[in-house]
Amino acid sequence: MPTISQLIRKGREEAVKKSAAPALKECPQKRGVCTRVYTTTPKKPNSALRKVARVRLTNGIEVTSYIPGIGHNLQEHSVVLVRGGRVKDLPGVRYHIVRGALDSAGVQNRNRGRSKYGTKRPKK
């Protein structure tokens, strides 16, 4: 326990917060090019074929990003927008692709939670 004089001289050291999405370099989103689009299986209690893409960002870092929603139009060389946000049951997947931005089309026939999947409001 430091004395008051020691605190006046040195002060308290602030703990450095570790970023959850370091490849974005403090940016909210980054643009990137898909280098590989594939499916992978989740961790133990779950079972599925999750759609993921390996993306080279504009800062040169290559990350694995999750493609949300049902169905997608992404292939190699597609230009995508990447945001932070991990997928709990896919180890090493710490980023999401933004649907409805750049080359990534929005999800078809989606009526609820449309803003998260880049879907326009349906005509009546």
Curated annotation (Swiss-Prot):
Kindly give the InterPro entries that the UniProt entry links to this protein. NA-bd_OB-fold, Ribosomal_uS12, Ribosomal_uS12_bac
Claim: Ribonucleoprotein is one of the keywords in the record: yes
Sample GO molecular function, one term = tRNA binding
Q: Can you name a GO cellular component term?
A: small ribosomal subunit
- CDD domains linked to this entry: Ribosomal_S12 (cd03368)
Give the modified residues of type 3-methylthioaspartic acid: D89
Decide whether keyword Signal is in the record: no
Matching Pfam families, A to Z?
Ribosom_S12_S23
**Disordered, as annotated region:** 104-124
Name the residue ranges with Basic residues bias. 111-124
Any transmembrane segments, and where? none
Keywords attached to this entry:
Methylation, Ribonucleoprotein, Ribosomal protein, RNA-binding, rRNA-binding, tRNA-binding
GO BP annotations of the record are: translation
> Assembly and partners?
Part of the 30S ribosomal subunit. Contacts proteins S8 and S17. May interact with IF1 in the 30S initiation complex.
What is the stated purpose of this protein? With S4 and S5 plays an important role in translational accuracy.
Q: Which family does it belong to?
A: Belongs to the universal ribosomal protein uS12 family.
Q: Under which name does UniProt file this protein?
A: Small ribosomal subunit protein uS12
Q: Give the source species.
A: Pelotomaculum thermopropionicum (strain DSM 13744 / JCM 10971 / SI)
Upper lineage is: Bacteria, Bacillati, Bacillota, Clostridia, Eubacteriales
